Each structure stands twice: as structure tokens, then as C-alpha cells.
Amino acid sequence: MEGSHSSNMERLEYLYLNLVGQVVQVRLVDDMCVEGLFVACTDVDAETDAGIMICCTRNLASAKRSPLSPSCVNFTDDLFIPYQSIVMIEVQNAKIRTETPGRPDTGRADFSATKFDWADDGVSELLESEPHQTGTWNQFEANEKSFGVKTTYKEEFYTTRLDHSKITEEQRAQADRLAREIESSSTRGIAHRMEREECLHDDEGLDEGQLYSDVHRPQEKKPPYVPPSTGGRKLVNEPPPVPAAAAPATAPTTAPAAAPAPAAAPPAAAPAAAAPPPPPAATSMADDGSMRHKRMNEDPHHMQYDANQTAAGFNPAAAPYTPMKPGAAVPVVDFLASLADAISNNDMCYDCEPHWPGMCNLFYDQDDSSYSQQNYEAAAMPPSHSMNMHMYVNSQPNIPNAHRGYQGPLGRVPHNQSMPMHHMQGQGFHHEMHHHQAFHGMGNYSSQHHNPPIQEYAPHKGQQGVVSRPGMRQGKGGGASRVEPQQPVSANTASSPPPVPTVDSAPNEVKPPAKLQRGRGMAAFTKGDMDGDSGATTNATGGPKKRVGK
């Protein structure tokens, strides 16, 4: 009875404990499936509320629930499900073990551990504890005695075969003496001392790398390094210096050779002639001293031509080399001064024309077209057209000062220069003169047909309009369909002023509405013919024409 109770109830309770916190799917008797987190359970024998408790529940898709229903998408609160409504509880990835990991009874509990001795007890002793006898044990004899294997080893295969009968007693005694010296001598390193079992006292302050890893080599005492210089240390094979007393002894031998020098010689040559040449031995020693900083096995290589030759007494701390000006002895100090001097002394330098204007900033442009030349002539002409055109040779009246300065010595611009365009003539000079008239630029004006500038005004009603000049665009008909640009007005003050506009005294209630009429030139307002009289008013401000009438 007790065994059956523990066999069922305890296993079920253990299963419920492993399901706590796991995601479970509970299938109910009404063919619904609910998913949630397992929280708790009650006893099966409880009188009331016997079941399980799950939280964060939602309904899964089934025959009664569609996948898009709110109960399948949204999570609800805790849900209590009684045992009588549960068909099956399904859980995935649940770890259920009846044994605790690491317990000794989880494996083969039926067999006991058996001790196995691989060797005798005496094998555990150290090799150093056994007594050693040098020279008495032979491996070949031991193998032959124990295993019956006879060796084929011969010493002659690995070394030179010696004939002991030819070795004398003196050689044997010498070999024994050297062997005793080697064996009794001190070791050369730490490794030898450790091989000979010479224990080190507290490792003698050496680290592990120095004891076992480093390679120890004998330290040779080398002289300290001396940097190369002219006054460096003395070489081993350097010849001894010449005594100081030898120099005056050689001076009288060369003095008579310099005595017959002429008196007219320059002062700078006297010290050079008086200085005796050094002896060959001293020259070679000086060369050795100057080349002392170079390598001993390097031969000096001299170039055929050196642009920067270094003197014998070269001083690195001296002022840098300054290039000399060709043909002079003064160094080039000021680059701008030398450049200006070179330009002024150059005969092939470009020479501009002497009459080029210095006030070219007064002109907007330099136009050499026929329009600019013709307009310039028209602007330079006086108001009276009866004067002779050839009288203006050296000076021209009514010319701006800027153009006066631009004229050549003969009154006109040179033939290889273009006529400038003045800013006062920039609006109407392209439309007032005939195209491509003859122009003479050698000092005089040629006979040309000039049309005087005409002031345009709006024609009065009943009068004929102004005759169009050459070069003007003709209208399309009596009534133009578009507004043409207003022609520029010449600055000629000799033309008659425009008439004064009349005052319209008609009452406002009698005036018909004004109509817009488009035309060319000046615009005017025209009043309708009410009483048989015709009148016209001119608008000085310009604009489209307006006609008033029925």
C-alpha cells in the first residue's frame, strides 16, 4: 500500500515541480487548447478547487477559435483549470531528472572498484636513490643475457679504428693526465654544475631564465666606442708625428727660391710665395689625419667635376655658401632689386605704345566694330553740319576728355588700335548710323553722309508720322500687334523741345471710357471728335497709346 502510494503521487508531485515556470499547453474536454506559464497546482484529493493555475494565457487556434480572434492574440490574466476539465498537459524542452548529477549511485552501482597494481611497490623509488656503479654495466651483455639478442654493434662503424699496439706509453700517460685535468677542473657554466650535481646555494640569485634557458657566453672585454673625429684616438699603425724642430730646418732651403721674386708682384702673392710647401711625408700624414673619420678599408673616390668643391679646411659651423652674381664679386642679396636691374638692362624687353591711355578704367569696353566707330564720329561732330569735315585734325570739339586722351598725335586713334566705347554713348549708337560706312583712321575724317539725330515724338492726330530711318525695324501694319522697344533719344540739344500737353476740359460724365491702343515711339492720349474739333495730348512719360471715341 505504501509502495503504490509513493510510486504514483510522489512522481506526479515531482513532475509538477519541474513544470513550474515552463510554457505548457493544456487541452480541455471541449476541444479547446490554452497556452500559458505553469504556476501552481492543488492536491487531487482536495474537496474544493482541485486543479492547476496558469498565467499569461491565450487560446490557441482550434475548431472553436480562429487564429485572428482577440483571445488568440491578446494575453489574459491568471486562469484556474480544474482537473476534471483537463485532457492532456503538453510541455516542450522540460528537463526532468530523477537522479542528481554527480552522485556516485548514478552510474554502475552494481560493481565495486577494484585496485589494479601495474608494477611492484619498489618501482616507486627514485632513480637517484639506487647505487650506481660506473663502467661495470654493459647493455649489450644485458640484452643477450635477458633476451638472447646478440648485438652487431662495432665501434669502427662510428669512429676511427685505433691500433692500440702503436700507442706508446708516453701518449697513454699524456691522455690520462689530460683526462684527470678535465674531470678535476671547474665547470664552465651553470648547466655543467647541475650535471655534476654541484648544488647551487639559493640559486645564487639567478632567475629561472638564467638557470635553464639563457645561453651563456664568455664576456670579452672590448674597448669603449669612441666616435670618429679629427682628433680621435691614435691608430695602432699610425706613424709617429714629425718633430717640431724639423720644420725650421727645411725653411732655409726654400727661402732662396722665393727671393728673386719681382718687386711689382701683388701683395697677396707674397705670403703665398713665402710659405714653403710641406714635405711629402708631412702631406701624407695630413691626408691620413683628414681621412681618419672615414672607414679604414674605404678608398677615397674623387669626382672629375664637383660643383660644390669643399676646401681643405672646411668648417661646418661657418656661414653657408652664397652664390655669386655672374661677372661681379658682390653676392646677390636682394632678389627684387636684381630682377628690376635685369629687366631695365634688357634690350629685348617688350615696349608698349607710348600713347596708350592711362585711364582705361573709364571705358566699359573696347569695341572695334563699325557701329562704335560710326557712333563715335557722330558724337564727335559739332551741331552744325555745314562745316568742313577735314578741319578737325589735331583737336576735336565736343569729345569727352577720356576720348581726347585716347587720340593719337594726329587727332585719331592709331591704325592698330580699336575705338573705345564710352559709357555716355552706350544706349543708342548701334541704331543711328548706317552699317559699315567707310572709316579712315590715319589722322583725318573722310567724306561721309551723316544723318543728324532726330528727336522722336508722338504724331498728332491727322498728321503723318516720322519717317523711319535706315536700320530701324519696320512695323507690320497700321495697327501693331505687339509693343516695340522705345528708340533711344539722342543727347543733341539743338533739336526742338516737345510741345506742351494741352489740358482736357471735357466733363467727366461726357468722357467715354478709354481704350488701349498699342503703337511705336512715344505714346499719346487722343480725345474723340465730339464738336468737330480735333486735339491731341502728348504724354511726356511715354507708354502705350490710348484713343478715346465712340
UniProtKB/Swiss-Prot annotation:
Keywords: Cytoplasm, Translation regulation. Disulfide bonds: none annotated. InterPro entries: ATXN2-like (IPR045117), LsmAD_domain (IPR009604), Sm (IPR047575), SM_dom_ATX (IPR025852). PROSITE patterns: SM. Residues 263-281 have a biased composition (Pro residues). Its main location: cytoplasm. Forms a complex composed of at least MKT1, PBP1, XAC1 and LSM12. Forms a complex composed of at least MKT1L, PBP1, XAC1 and LSM12. Within the complex, interacts with MKT1 (via C-terminus); the interaction is direct. Interacts (via C-terminus) with ZC3H11; the interaction is direct. Belongs to the ataxin-2 family. Involved in post-transcriptional regulation of gene expression. Promotes mRNA stabilization by bridging poly(A)-binding protein to mRNAs. This is PAB1-binding protein 1. It comes from Trypanosoma brucei brucei (strain 927/4 GUTat10.1). The gene is PBP1.
